Swiss-Prot record:
Segments forming a coiled coil: none
Species in which this protein is naturally found: Drosophila ananassae (Fruit fly)
One Pfam short name: SOSSC
Signal peptide range in chain numbering: none
Protein name: SOSS complex subunit C homolog
Family (UniProt): Belongs to the SOSS-C family.
A biological-process GO annotation: DNA repair
Length: 123
């Protein structure tokens, strides 16, 4: 049979669990957790693609970014600098702090034409 836990032991266990949850919550909110993503990556420029400058998320485009969380700002700037598209900051009740806008790329024309099939003559 298991020994009954005293209320002091149960309170101590509950306190430790709550402290651990609070620590994890602070780490997530502060953006301290490093996911190993290199934010200094260079993006290859495609030929024929116009170069666009995306506005800084912290500027408050249309007043949208003024109430954005620091985590959203920290995710917006490196993401917008490492992709081919750009992002539009927005105020959303669903947690979408910015929307991706990706360029529509036209397929490359085929420069190598396949030769027509010729019948084999057996004589």
């Amino acid at each position: 049979m298991a020994f009954p836990t005293t209320s002091a032991q149960q309170a101590d266990t509950t306190r430790k669990i709550l402290e651990e949850i609070q620590t994890k919550k602070q780490l997530l909110a502060g953006g301290i957790i490093n996911l190993g993503i290199n934010t200094q990556m260079s993006t290859p420029q495609l030929l024929g693609q116009p170069t666009t400058v995306t506005p800084d998320f912290q500027l408050g485009v249309g007043g949208v970014a003024a109430n954005a969380t620091p985590t959203a700002r920290a995710a917006f700037n490196p993401t917008s600098s490492t992709t081919l598209g750009f992002f539009v900051p927005q105020d959303s009740y669903f947690g979408n702090s910015f929307l991706p806008v990706l360029p529509r790329l036209e397929p490359l024309p085929s420069s190598i034409a396949t030769p027509p099939a010729t019948p084999i003559n057996n004589k």
